From Swiss-Prot:
Induction: Expressed exclusively on media containing carbon sources that allow efficient sporulation.
Classification via Pfam families: Alpha-amylase (PF00128), Alpha-amylase_C (PF02806), CBM_48 (PF02922)
Gene3D superfamilies associated with the record: Glycosidases, Golgi alpha-mannosidase II, Immunoglobulins
GO terms assigned for molecular function: 1,4-alpha-glucan branching enzyme activity; cation binding; hydrolase activity, hydrolyzing O-glycosyl compounds
PANTHER family named in the record: 1,4-ALPHA-GLUCAN-BRANCHING ENZYME
EC number: 2.4.1.18
Function: Catalyzes the formation of the alpha-1,6-glucosidic linkages in glycogen by scission of a 1,4-alpha-linked oligosaccharide from growing alpha-1,4-glucan chains and the subsequent attachment of the oligosaccharide to the alpha-1,6 position.
Official protein name in the record: 1,4-alpha-glucan branching enzyme GlgB
Catalytically driven reaction(s): Transfers a segment of a (1->4)-alpha-D-glucan chain to a primary hydroxy group in a similar glucan chain
The UniProt record lists the keyword Transferase: yes
Amino acid sequence: MAAASPTAHDVYLFHEGSLFKSYQLFGSHYRELNGKSGYEFCVWAPHASEVRVAGDFNSWSGEEHVMHRVNDNGIWTLFIPGIGEKERYKYEIVTNNGEIRLKADPYAIYSEVRPNTASLTYDLEGYSWQDQKWQKKQKAKTLYEKPVFIYELHLGSWKKHSDGRHYSYKELSQTLIPYIKKHGFTHIELLPVYEHPYDRSWGYQGTGYYSPTSRFGPPHDLMKFVDECHQQNIGVILDWVPGHFCKDAHGLYMFDGEPLYEYKEERDRENWLWGTANFDLGKPEVHSFLISNALYWAEFYHIDGFRVDAVANILYWPNQDERHTNPYAVDFLKKLNQTMREAYPHVMMIAEDSTEWPQVTGAVEEGGLGFHYKWNMGWMNDVLKYMETPPEERRHCHQLISFSLLYAFSEHFVLPFSHDEVVYGKKSLLNKMPGDYWQKFAQYRLLLGYMTVHPGKKLIFMGSEFAQFDEWKDTEQLDWFLDSFPMHQKASVFTQDLLRFYQKSKILYEHDHRAQSFEWIDVHNDEQSIFSFIRYGQKHGEALVIICNFTPVVYHQYDVGVPFFTQYIEVLNSDSETYGGSGQINKKPLSAKKGALHHKPCYITMTIPPYGISILRAVKKRGEIKR
C-alpha cells in the first residue's frame, strides 16, 4: 500500500466524496525519500490551528514534528525519517482555542492492545495469498445461486484459554476453521473485528475502522486466517458499522476540537440510544472515509461480505418521536453499494434492517438501495413467537408461519437467528422451546429444519449448532462441556447432517429467490398445526416435499398431496433416533397414488413425526416423472 504525497486530484476527490482509496493517502505509510527511509503521515483536521505527530520516537512531544498544511480544507502531512515498524504514535491536535488533544490515527492499520490506544506504524505489504481457487470460484457463479449458511460468531467468546485469554487469529485458524468445515457452514460472520476500546460493546462501538483489533494478533495473522478459511471453502463476512462510532477521547469524536466525522447539530450527532456519535453522512469526506474502508477490507483482507449494522438508524434521523428519512444517508447507502458492486461484484452487501423500507435489495438504477441481501427480521420474529407459543395454542396463530410467504420474494432475504435473539434474557434457541427436555430438543431440530427449507439464505449464532441451553454469555466461552451430554451430541450431528443436505440440494439455494421455487401443499391445516409445501428445482421433476408438524402428535397413514405421479423417498427426518428423536420415520419409498388431494394430481400416505420435519425427494420410477 504505497503512499504518496497528496496530489491536487487526490485532494479534490477526497473533498468531493469519491476518493475511494483514501487509505493510500491518509494514515502512516512506509516511504523512502531522498535516500532516507521512514514513515509519511497524513491526516484531515480542518479546524485545527496546528497538528503534530507525537510518539515514542520523540518522547511524546510533537513540537519537533509539526505537520505541514496542504490546503485550506485541512489536510496535513509530514515525513519522518528513521521511524521503523510498530512505532507508537498519535496526532497532537492543537484546537482553535489552544487546547491540545492526543488522537489515534483514523486511518491507522494497526493499534495497541486495549486499554492502550496509540496507533502503530505497520506495513501491510508482503503477505502471499493462497486463495486463488476460492476467488476464481466466487467469480464464476452468480451470487444469488450459491448456498449460504452463515455461522455468526464473536471471536472473543467462542473459545477461551483456561486462564481467560482470547484465542489468537493463529489459534482460531487451527481450531475454528476445522470446526466450521466439520459442521458444513458455508460462511462465518464475525462480529466487528476493527479496533474498539470496550470488550462488551462486541465491536459495535468502534473507532479504528482500518485497524483489525490487536486483541487477537497483528494484521497479517488475520489475513492468514481469512486465507485459510478460503482454502477450506469457507467465506468470511464482517459485521460493519458505518452509522455511528464510540465517543472515547482518543477516537474520531470531536477530532479536531469540533464536530468533524459526526453531525454538527447535537440532536443529529448524539446517538442517545447507544451513547455513541452518528457519522455525518452528508459530508463528502466521510463518504470517502467509509466507502474506502469497505473497499480496503475487500482488497487487503479478501473479505467476502459485509453485514451493515443498524440500517434503520442510518436511514432515519435519530432522536425523534416520528421517523423522518435522512436523505444524506439514503444517498450514502446507494453510493456505497454501487461502488462495491462495481469494484467487487462477488462481495455480498447485507442489510440488517428492521424497517419496511422498499427495495432494500433493489438495483440502485431502479430506485433501490443496492444491497444484495436483507435480514428478514419479520420472519424471525414471527417464527420465534410461534415456537414460544404452547403447542396446543399454535392453531390460533397459524398465520405466523404462513405470512412470510406473502413477501418472501419481494427482497433477497437472509433468515437470521442472530446474537441479538440469544442474549439479555431472551434465552437460547433451545430454551425458547416450550415443554420438557425431550420436547425442547425436538422443536429445536424442527426449527432449524424449517429455516433450512424456507426460501432465503440462512444464519445462526454460535452455540446454536449444538443446542446450548444458556443464552450467550459474552464474557465467557461457549458451553463446550455440553458435548459430553448425549442429546447435545445428537443435536450437533443433526446440524451437520442438515447443513450437508442443504449444500448438496441445489433445489434449496439455486433459485430460492424466485417465487416459482415454492408452492404450498396445505397451508390451512391450523387444527393440527401441520404445514406442507414443495420446493422445486430448475429442472422438471426436481422437487422436495416437506411436512412440518408443530405438535407432539404422531400421525400414521397421513395423506399428503404431491405434484408428480412417482416415488418419494425420505431424505431427512428430524425425529430419527440418530438425532435424539422417537424414530417415527418413513423407511420405505412412498409411491404416489391416483386421486387429487390438496389441489395436486396425486397423493402419498406417510407417517408424520411429532415435533418433526420430514423431507421427501421425488425420484424417477420407470421412465419420466409424470405430472
